[in-house]
Amino acid sequence: MTIRLVIVEPEGAYNLGFIARLVKNFLIDEFYVVNPKCDINEAIKFSAKGSEVIEKMMKITNNFDDAIRDVDLKIATSSIADIKGDLLRKSIRPIDLERLIKDKKVAFIFGRESVGLTREEIAKSDFLLFIPANPEYPVLNLSHAVGIVLYELWRNRDNKVPTVSSEPIKLIDDYSKKITDILVNKEATKSMYLVLKRVLIKGIEDNEEAMTIVRILRKIYVRLAKKENESDKLL
């Protein structure tokens, strides 16, 4: 398992410093910061032993897509989740992570202190992670939220769970997109695709199940594509 931590436009130097320390605490593999809005030198003052993380390990980019490239799964985080009728906000919990990320390269994405991640940024992710808290005050400090997630990853790192390789996951992603492109009107395609992909991937226990799902999706796609081509010829 390889973990990449992505922080988008951090606004507080203290939070960035505390997060750098957490990166060292929990042996995170990669640390990306997108378009930081705070003073990096100021952040170093808050990082203690994590100063070398900022100075040597942290990668700064101005492009969100660059920060989430070349990973198997992208997991966004938000304190706003499971809003009725909002498919984009359907979430998973920290307890779901163990099985989903085993033996994969995963990016965990945290947003701005003020407004979090945009809907566009969440839509580019595979899952939305929500940390349950007091419903009347669910918003956690950025560095605290990062700490909770990284602790969960550390706690489960040596547990033996069935693994699903990245290749069938990519195929499920691909066929889910192709099927929804055919079946659903363009306005609803993105939401339906995300829901289909999330439900399928979340429910898979091992590679055998994953490949069974891939075969089913492939057959569905081939039949749908054939019917669509036949319909086009009649026009």
UniProtKB/Swiss-Prot annotation:
Transmembrane segments: none annotated. It is an enzyme of class 2 (transferase). Its main location: cytoplasm. It is found in: Cytoplasm. Changing V139S: No change in activity. Changing K84E: Decrease in activity. Keywords: Cytoplasm, Methyltransferase, S-adenosyl-L-methionine, Transferase, tRNA processing. GO terms for cellular component: cytosol. Changing S47L: Decrease in activity. Changing P138S: No change in activity. GO terms for molecular function: RNA binding; tRNA (cytidine(32)/uridine(32)-2'-O)-methyltransferase activity. Catalyzes the formation of 2'O-methylated cytidine (Cm32) at position 32 in tRNA. Is specific for cytidine. NCBIfam families: tRNAmeth_TrmJ_Sulfolob. This is tRNA (cytidine-2'-O-)-methyltransferase TrmJ.
